[in-house]
Regions:
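Feature captures the catalytic cores and cofactor-binding loops of soluble hydro-lyases/lyases
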Residues: 1-147
Length: 147
C-alpha cells in the first residue's frame, strides 16, 4: 500500500427516512441485532452534554482511517460531508494526541455534520460538555493533533 492518503468516492448513502426511523432505536438493541459485533465497545463514551437521555446519533457514516494524532483526512471528510453525515474516525484507539478539538468540531457542525464517533482522543472537553453536538470518543487529552 502506498504511503499517503486515499479518498474513495461514491459511497452509498442511507435513505433519510430510514435514518430518522433508526434514530429512535436504542443503541443496545442495535448492538444485540448485530450479534454484538461492530459496536463501539466499553471505551467509547459520550463527550458532549447528553443529560436527560438526549445526545444520540444516527446518519450515513463517512469513515476515516488515520494515523494516531493526524487529522488531515478528517478535515477532508468535513469538506465532502453532506448534511446529516456522521464522521466515524479510526485513529487506532490512540489517546496520546487528539484528532478532534473544539474548532474542528464547530466547523463540522456549521457544515451540517451530525456528529463524530472517534476511536481515539479529543481535546477541549469543557467545550463539548457545554454543548450538545454529539461526539463520542475513547479518550481525552490536552495534546493537539498534527496534519
Amino acid at each position: 500500500m502506498p504511503v499517503g492518503f486515499r479518498w474513495v468516492r461514491g459511497h452509498v448513502r442511507a435513505d433519510r427516512a430510514l435514518v430518522e426511523r433508526f434514530a429512535a432505536v436504542p443503541v443496545a438493541i442495535v448492538s444485540d441485532n448485530m450479534n454484538r459485533m461492530f459496536a463501539g465497545g466499553a471505551d467509547l463514551r459520550p463527550m458532549h452534554a447528553c443529560e436527560g437521555g438526549g445526545g444520540g446519533l444516527a446518519g450515513t457514516a463517512l469513515t476515516v482511517l488515520t494515523r494516531p494524532g493526524d487529522n488531515l483526512v478528517i478535515h477532508k471528510a468535513i469538506d465532502v460531508a453532506e448534511p446529516g453525515d456522521v464522521i466515524v474516525v479510526d485513529a487506532g484507539g490512540d489517546t496520546t494526541s487528539a484528532v478532534v478539538g473544539e474548532l474542528i468540531a464547530r466547523h463540522a457542525q456549521v457544515c451540517g455534520v451530525a456528529g463524530f464517533v472517534i476511536n481515539g482522543a479529543i481535546r477541549d472537553l469543557d467545550a463539548f460538555r457545554a454543548g450538545s453536538f454529539p461526539i463520542f470518543a475513547t479518550g481525552v487529552t490536552h495534546r493537539g493533533p498534527y496534519k
